[in-house]
């Protein structure tokens, strides 16, 4: 969207310059005078400067708005939300994204500016139409069902690389699934020590019991919500995705605390580095422990 607007501004500049040059030939002063020509050139220079300034301000406007949102509270709730309590609870599955964005947690509207929201969808998810939105959201639905937690638990028990490789060969028929699981096992071994140290999980057993489904459920809810607000999908379509995420989360998780831990575990298995995991852990602690957190106001149970 930004690109289209910038293109329009440049096109307007070109049109203005063309009209100014045409005016130069239509409006003549007595022969030998360059006053008219100089005046036209001056106006063109002013127009160029104006467009450059406008484009620059436009490009940084949303960054400034994003910066100003950082001064809002951690938990922005709309007291006049039109959603039912149950619908608000489901929206809170995407709370991590809303806290990061300093946006609303309990409504379909995110609080993001239209241009910022649509640019993010296009840049990060290649979403700019109904079809592309459905493709991306269906992909996230599939990701919600890809749970390798039991396999990671077995790998923790086996410890040795060769034993784990044999286990994967014996377990998976599809080599792509085996490869994906192996990658998650590698990441689990890499980060389990820090996650225990940070108090996210007690041990390897809790890591594999909780799993990472909340990470994918969070993304599905947050992206479906943004797509609905941007009119790429209908609200009815959005709720189908949200309901699916809710069902997947409740298959293995029973509390907001477990859901929060599961988000960090999923972030780890997805490939986040130590810094990003530290940041997501801070947000989860706020959501779990802060008395003002909406996770304290709404039960996780249906």
Q: What spans do the regions from the language model cover?
A:
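Serine-esterase "nucleophile elbow" of acetyl-processing enzymes
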Residues: 39
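Polar/charged low-complexity regulatory segments
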Residues: 23-24, 29-35, 43-228, 232-235, ...
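N-terminal secretory/membrane targeting signals
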Residues: 1-23
């Amino acid at each position: 969207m930004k690109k289209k607007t910038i293109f329009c501004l440049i096109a307007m500049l070109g049109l203005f310059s063309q009209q100014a040059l045409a005016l130069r030939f239509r409006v003549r002063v007595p022969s030998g005078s360059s006053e008219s020509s100089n005046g036209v050139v001056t106006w063109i220079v002013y127009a160029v400067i104006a467009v450059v300034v406008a484009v620059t301000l436009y490009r940084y406007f949303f960054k400034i708005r994003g910066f100003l949102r950082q001064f809002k509270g951690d938990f922005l709730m709309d007291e006049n939300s039109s959603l039912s309590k149950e619908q608000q609870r489901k929206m809170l599955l995407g709370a991590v994204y809303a806290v990061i964005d300093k946006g609303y947690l309990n409504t379909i509207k995110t609080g993001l500016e239209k241009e910022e929201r649509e640019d993010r969808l296009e840049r990060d998810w290649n979403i700019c139409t109904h079809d592309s939105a459905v493709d991306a959201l269906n992909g996230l639905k599939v990701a919600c069902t890809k749970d390798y937690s039991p396999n990671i638990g077995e790998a923790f028990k086996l410890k040795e690389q060769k034993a784990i490789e044999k286990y994967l060969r014996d377990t998976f028929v599809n080599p792509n699934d085996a490869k994906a699981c192996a990658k998650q096992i590698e990441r689990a071994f890499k980060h389990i020590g820090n996650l225990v140290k940070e108090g996210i999980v007690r041990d390897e057993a809790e890591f594999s019991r909780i799993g990472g489904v909340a990470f994918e459920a969070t993304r599905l809810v947050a992206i479906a919500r943004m797509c609905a607000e941007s009119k790429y999908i209908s609200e009815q379509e959005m709720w189908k995705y949200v309901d699916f995420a809710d069902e997947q989360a409740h298959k293995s998780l029973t509390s907001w605390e477990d859901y929060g831990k599961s988000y960090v575990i999923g972030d780890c298995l997805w490939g986040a580095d130590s810094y990003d995991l530290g940041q997501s852990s801070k947000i989860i602690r706020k959501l779990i422990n802060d008395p003002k957190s909406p996770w304290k106001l709404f039960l996780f149970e249906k």
